[in-house]
Regions:
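Alpha/beta enzyme core
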Residues: 3-11, 27-52, 59-75, 84-202, ...
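Generic N-terminal amphipathic, Lys/Arg-enriched alpha-helix
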Residues: 5-20, 254-255
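Hydrophobic "anchor" residues on beta-strands that sit immediately upstream
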Residues: 19, 79, 101, 131, ...
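Glycine-rich beta-to-alpha transition loops that act as phosphate-gripper elements at the mouths
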Residues: 24, 80-86, 205-217
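Generic enzyme active-site microenvironment
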Residues: 81, 133-135, 208, 275
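Active-site-adjacent C-terminal substructures of enzyme catalytic domains
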Residues: 188-190, 195, 205, 257-265
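Extended, intrinsically disordered, low-complexity segments
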Residues: 246-286
Length: 286
């Protein structure tokens, strides 16, 4: 059985750990993520974005991930998720394809527009038994901001507004903004831990954190204790894959693509396993 994210994250919330939601783009990254879950006996979320749909074909990549996930679903809990759906139409298409979990990202819209579209997404999802993630506050991207000059107050989740948002929309999980940014940064701002705690006090459902791919274990542990039940991981997956490719291409004249891509897959699997241990999800597959 393939899961939505709601069930996995509610279990994580009760168990005091977090589940990793790892982005895939192809055969190799999909196998790396699921192989890591099997090795670690960890629940896992395999997710895709609109850009991956454009690259690999939405239905094609979903069916591949679904086939692999179903093959191993008896061993570990696996969820498949649409990450950062930017419009109702993309979310609707993903549900039609068969995604058991979707995210509508209206974080750059006005609060009213975010709520309006989010309610439409939830209404559609409820008719199909699909889990829904919303986002309030915004997580900027590498290149979009200067870490020295950014005014984080423009991006942060407001705890009181988060309570209203969850009540008005009926989302299953909520992505929050506490001073993180997508991508790897040389200089990191300090996360607003108190803001996270304030959100968690007002919102009882599982909270998701984006933009923390390069965090070390102390920060990870801190936000889990304050309410985070899921970490999105994209940049770390890509860098591990690229690192594996560079390593074999720089050290040999190998031309067998299976060996070259296999080396990248191995490097990626090991990086994902490290994240699972950090999140505390290893051994939680039951």
């Amino acid at each position: 059985m393939i899961h939505g994210t709601k069930e996995l994250l509610e279990s994580a919330q009760k168990g005091g750990y977090a589940v990793g939601a790892f982005n895939t783009i192809n055969v190799e990254t999909t196998r790396a993520i699921i192989d890591a879950a099997l090795e670690e006996r960890s629940p896992v979320i395999v997710q895709m974005t609109e850009k991956t749909f454009d690259y690999a074909g939405g239905r094609a990549i979903f069916q591949y991930v679904k086939n692999v996930a179903e093959f191993y679903a008896g061993d570990v809990p696996i969820a498949i998720h649409l990450d950062h759906g930017k419009s109702f139409e993309v979310v609707e298409r993903s549900i039609e394809i068969g995604f058991p979990s979707v995210m509508y990202d209206g974080s750059r819209k006005s609060y009213a527009d975010n709520v309006r579209t989010m309610k439409k997404v939830v209404a559609l999802a409820r008719t199909r038994g699909v889990s829904v993630q919303g986002e309030l506050g915004s997580v900027p991207y590498l290149g979009e901001i200067s870490m020295e000059d950014v005014d984080w107050n423009e991006y942060m989740t407001d705890p009181e507004q988060a309570e209203d948002f969850v009540r008005e929309t009926g989302v299953d999980t909520l992505a929050v903004a506490i001073g993180t940014a997508h991508g790897f940064f040389r200089e990191r701002s300090e996360p607003d831990y108190e803001r996270l705690s304030a959100v968690a006090k007002r919102v009882s459902l599982p909270l998701v954190l984006h933009g923390a791919s390069d965090w070390e274990s102390d920060r990870v542990t801190e936000v889990i204790t304050r309410g985070i039940s899921c970490f999105n991981v994209d940049t770390a997956v890509r860098l591990a894959f690229i690192g594996g490719l560079r390593k074999i291409l720089d050290s040999s004249d190998e031309t067998d693509l299976r060996k070259i891509l296999g080396a990248a897959r191995k490097e990626t699997r090991e990086a994902v396993q490290k994240k699972m241990r950090m999140f505390g999800s290893s051994g939680k597959a039951g």
